Amino acid sequence: AENTVSFDFSKFLSGQENLILQGDTVTDDSNRCLVLTRENNGRPVQDSVGRVLYQTPIHLWDKQIDKEASFETSFTFFIYRENINRGGDGITFFLAPTDTQPKSGGGYLGIFKDAESNETVVAVEFDTFSNRWDPANSHIGINVNSVKSKITTPWGLKNDYFTVTITYDATRSLSVSSFYRNKPDDIFTVKASVHLRDALPQWVRIGLSAATGDLVEQHRLYSWSFKSVLPLDSST
């Protein structure tokens, strides 16, 4: 026996079931995507935070039977900048308590309150602006309870569709593999050993977040799929 949650959004349209839009996120029906941070006539604005959550909570681990879920998620986004060298602040995939609400914008990416506090969240960040706690350039990072990434890898920005796959397995390895549509052989990877049950409650919600600060860019989400499996019997 197992407890499974799975979904596959190949596009986003108004009134899509099982999604919770938070902050500034809206649906763009003509482009069949989610516009994560606010735009005025297609131009991104400062100090915006937007998020989308999957409505059904995920059973991440079970204390009684001492089991942890494994999962895989994939999504495609497009970060557009008029000037490729100037913008902010990025997109994250995150797992958080089921009552999670948007936090601070800018470099906090809608999932952290500030630089000091411990947040009940695990995230993969696609960070497009180097804050004081960040490496020097745009990067992909794995964050466990803190805005300061546990591990990062450099990531060059292009105005192109970017596809990400994140897996978490029974060996407690969280790994990220990602590429631009026009350069599919150029793969950005990062992985870390993460014990999710030490960082998160047994039930979580999953989502994607984005934020702008003083600098801006478009953050648009075009597809998102997910599957988690929690073994329920103690034999497996």
From Swiss-Prot:
Keywords: Glycoprotein, Lectin, Mannose-binding. Glycans are attached at residue 118. Transmembrane segments: none annotated. Pfam families: Lectin_legB (PF00139). GO terms for molecular function: D-mannose binding. Homodimer of noncovalently associated chains. D-mannose and D-glucose specific lectin. Belongs to the leguminous lectin family. This is Lectin.
